Amino acid sequence: MKFLIKSLAVATISILGCLQTALAEEAKTESLTDKAVKHEKLGVKIESANHLFAEKYPLQYDSWKSTAKSTDRGSALEADPRYVILWAGYAFAKDYNKPRGHFYAVTDVRDILRTGAPKDENDGPQPMACWTCKGPDVPRLIEEKGERGYFDPKWAKYGAEIVNSIGCADCHDTTSEEFKQGKPALRVARPHVLRALNTVGWKFEDLDKHGKRPAVCANCHVEYYFKNKTDVTFPWDKGVDVDSIEKYYDEINFTDWTHALSKAPMLKTQHPDFEVWSQGTHGKNGVTCIDCHMPKVKDKDGKVYTDHKIGNPFDQFEATCKTCHEQSKETLEKRVKEYKHEVKEAMIRLEDQLVKAHFEAKAAWEAGATQEEMKEILMAIRHAQWRWDYSAAGHGNHFHAPDVMLRTIATGIDRAADARAKLGVVLAKHGVTTPVAIPDISTKEKAQLAIGLDIPKEQAAKDEFLKTVVPQWEKEARAKGLLPAEEADKPVAAPKAEAK
């Protein structure tokens, strides 16, 4: 008996010793979030070349590559020329296209007039931050160069390095054993994203798989700004709703640009999809981006996999909506179309008020208005347009949270009306008693002419850039193995949807 007790005691001490050692080792191991908060390198390995995963994961890769089929990138400025006036003085007034597949993220940011036509690595209007959402080469470069080494240069500095469009390593730890075994191995490797998630209580390492799914989408589908004109930063310190972010920007006196007509200190919303989703019925009930946009499907042989052709849930209704909803596809589609119509109709009303406010403010300045007279008016314009852009810039906001969007737009209309009422008083005071004339802005070209843009000149410079600089970037990238030696498209079979 004494021997047994002694043996148990020794075993217990050994187990406790091992446990203490394990706990001590765990305490020494900092999470990626902990490192990001301290602005340290994450110490991770990132394989960013998408083509390297085509052979091992053909179903996922081919479905991802099928986003190349979304070839239409129609101009949002042509569809609604009011945008040109709302963004007068900002690069978005030059060129702003409708969204298309992840496959084109790098191509589209190269092609867009907003990034200019740099002739060398120190030329051009934009910082490196403009690459930050575009692909897995970004977290690789941040890890290699450090945040300062990545964010400080001009956009053209690493054009030959950022060549893989949004892909595998943006969401997965592609070098891990877990990933090699065919498991998701979800990971966020952009330090600024880890910091932002941590700010709103979403420390990535503490999330379960359902939390990690939308968190990886928050790599890009979020509102952000360029702190110190270079660093991508999420304005979530006070919350993610429209009022909290507005308050954050106001308190730090942040301005994206000064409006060319009204001189208002403007904010440009990016794409607050994560923020709006989190406020809607799906977000509140734990239905994530993946559930609706990346369902489980079957290939022709019956093998189940996650479809990486991110698209409209109605395209795979049985595998998406039908897993929760009893209604027919036709019923739900009709409801979503109604949401879209209601939100779009309200949005256009706000746009019309803002266009008039910008031109009326311009007239007030020309009539002799003072800074003191215009101060409250300009802030009302700023807040009204922030609410419009928060609603307009997202992808599918009318579906993700239609009630939030309608409320946001309604408060925007209130602020625009307040600005215009006060402008009427100021204009009258300075002798302007007739309605301010609004030029013909019925087309994109006419609207751009009204604000003095020379688009043919900008397009000619861009065409030269695409013909001379970009091919050199791609040549260098292929030499480094970041792109395959040659690419050949192969047919992609459409997946068969399957209910979960």
UniProtKB/Swiss-Prot annotation:
Purpose of the protein: Catalyzes the reduction of nitrite to ammonia, consuming six electrons in the process.
Positions of region (Disordered): 477-500
Localization of this protein: Periplasm
SUPFAM superfamilies: Multiheme cytochromes
CDD domains, A to Z: NrfA-like
Key word Ribonucleoprotein present: no
Keywords: Calcium, Electron transport, Heme, Iron, Metal-binding, Oxidoreductase, Periplasm, Signal, Transport
Residues the record lists as binding heme c 2: 168, 171-172, 308
Positions annotated to bind heme c 5: 282, 321, 324-325
InterPro entries from the UniProt entry: Cyt_c552, Cyt_c_NO2Rdtase_formate-dep, Multihaem_cyt_sf
Residues the record lists as binding heme c 3: 102, 217, 220-221
Taxon lineage: Bacteria, Pseudomonadati, Pseudomonadota, Gammaproteobacteria, Pasteurellales
Organism whose genome encodes this protein: Mannheimia haemolytica
GO molecular-function terms, A-Z: calcium ion binding; heme binding; iron ion binding; nitrite reductase (cytochrome, ammonia-forming) activity
Record carries keyword Iron: yes
Protein name: Cytochrome c-552
Gene Ontology cellular component annotations, sorted alphabetically: outer membrane-bounded periplasmic space
